[in-house]
């Protein structure tokens, strides 16, 4: 009996751990096309009635083969995200994707995806990429970086701060990324800290960054753009 109880407990722990590690809930049917007009609020979207689903719920003419405009971006990049908000058929499937265009010397600034791991491949040009670990016991945050060329692949673990930078002075770069959530979210670090609405107290930020309040006030006065479309 004791042995049976032990194995039952082990199985339950494994089941709970599996659920805790999942980015998005696993689907319980073939598909669950998002009903974005439903008044019901759930974690994700409720399903559209299966009899009303058609092939266009799984299709989007996204024009990802076309270069995107980076000229209006201070960061020199343009992220075209295809998530459940644009493609209803992604609901419950735990995946999304993005095309990222980089101007010469452009970057996708340091940011995190709180709900997804990202895997990225370079289609054109060269990218300097990296991510930083969470706070370690020794007080360090380790930086992992790599220079990627066309066809190379790099993975950014879920929730960690990461970036991509085009080092070329005269050539643009293009990448495609896949993310392990239908709605991965993005928190651009500088935008969140210095461009929040309402502003974080300059007393807090001056102490945190060990600079005077004038530097904080100047940073908060800047326009912090969102390069994600």
Curated annotation (Swiss-Prot):
Checking Gene3D superfamilies in the record gives:
Jelly Rolls
Chief subcellular location equals secreted
Q: Name one GO molecular function term.
A: manganese ion binding
Cellular compartments annotated: Secreted, Extracellular space, Apoplast
- What is one cellular component GO term in this UniProt entry? apoplast
Q: Does the keyword Glycoprotein apply?
A: yes
Known Pfam families for this protein?
Cupin_1
Signal peptide, first to last residue: 1-22
**Which residues bear sugar attachments?**
78
* Positions contributing to Mn(2+) binding: 111, 113, 118, 162
Q: Does the entry annotate any disulfide bonds, and if so which pairs?
A: 32-47
Q: Which residues form the Cupin type-1 domain?
A: 62-217
Q: Which UniProt keywords apply?
A: Apoplast, Disulfide bond, Glycoprotein, Manganese, Metal-binding, Secreted, Signal
The answer to whether the entry has keyword Zinc-finger is: no
**What job does this protein perform?**
May play a role in plant defense. Probably has no oxalate oxidase activity even if the active site is conserved.
The record's family statement is:
Belongs to the germin family.
Q: How does it assemble?
A: Oligomer (believed to be a pentamer but probably hexamer).
User: How is this protein named in the record?
Assistant: Germin-like protein 12-2
* Organism of derivation: Oryza sativa subsp. japonica (Rice)
């Amino acid at each position: 009996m004791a042995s049976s109880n032990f194995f039952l407990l082990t199985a339950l722990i494994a089941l709970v751990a599996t659920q805790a590690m999942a980015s998005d809930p696993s689907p319980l049917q073939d598909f669950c096309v998002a009903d974005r007009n439903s008044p019901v609020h759930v974690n994700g979207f409720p399903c559209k009635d299966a009899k009303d689903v058609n092939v266009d719920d799984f299709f989007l003419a996204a024009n990802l083969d076309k270069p995107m405009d980076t000229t209006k971006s201070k960061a020199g990049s343009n992220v075209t995200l295809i998530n459940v908000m644009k493609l209803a058929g992604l609901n419950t499937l735990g995946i999304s994707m993005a095309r990222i265009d980089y101007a010469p010397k452009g970057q996708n600034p340091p940011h995190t995806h709180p709900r997804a791991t990202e895997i990225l491949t370079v289609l054109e040009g060269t990218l300097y990429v990296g991510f930083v670990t969470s706070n370690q016991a020794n007080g360090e945050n380790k930086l992992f970086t790599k220079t990627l060329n066309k066809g190379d692949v790099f993975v950014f673990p879920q929730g960690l701060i990461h970036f991509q930078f085009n080092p070329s002075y005269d050539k643009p770069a293009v990448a495609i990324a896949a993310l392990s959530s239908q709605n991965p979210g993005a928190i651009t670090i500088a935008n969140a800290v210095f461009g929040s609405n309402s502003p974080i107290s300059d007393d807090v930020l001056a102490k945190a960054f060990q600079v005077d309040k004038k530097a904080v006030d100047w940073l908060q006065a800047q326009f912090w753009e969102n390069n994600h479309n």
